[in-house]
Amino acid sequence: MFNRVTLLALVSMLILSLAGCGGGEPAQQAQPAAEPAPPPKPEEVPVYELTKDDITSHAGWTSRNVSILGVKLGDRTRDVEKELGAVENTRTLSEDYLTVHQGQGLFVYTFKITGKARKFEVNETFAKKVTDAKLKRLLTSGDMKTMRDVLGMEEGDPVQNAEDNSTEYVYDSRGIRFIKYKVGGKTVNALRFSEMKKTT
């Protein structure tokens, strides 16, 4: 009797196993996996060289349109070191590496994590290499009327920075700041090009 029960249990399990393996549903053909969408291409903008082009003659120019010695914001600085010239000084800041070039007229801020240029600062020492007469005059004179003629009205009040003894005139929607540094009783004028920020 025990043998019959065991035999019946084994046959039942075999039948259930085969029934589970048999495809009661029609077989579906394997479909290839959908390809991921390509990342959106960055918007193409014309680029104007600070040392060759009359930048202010182009309507709507921003920091994204400006290159300095062939280097643009977002370029990997290791790839373009020779265009910038010899490194005269370096500093390590909290988020950036700062390198100084061109007779201390060009400051390049490189983001530590990506190695990409995220800010350029051009001061009056570099003005002799600037082609645009209006920008050259702004850097050499620091005249507020010239600043407003070239860049328009500021976006808010000037920012006082006690840490580096400077006053910054803000044009963040264009990625530009005009800065006046007080250094040893003298005023040094500079233009900072950085990533554009949204203003409200």
Task: For the regions a language model picked out, list residue spans one by one.
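Hydrophobic helical h-region of N-terminal Sec-dependent signal peptides
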Residues: 10-15
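A cross-family detector of function-defining hotspots
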Residues: 45-50, 55-61, 65-67, 72-121, ...
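Bacterial signal peptide processing site
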Residues: 22-25
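Bacterial N-terminal signal peptides that target proteins for export
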Residues: 1-8
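C-terminal motif of bacterial Sec signal peptides marking the signal peptidase cleavage site
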Residues: 17-20
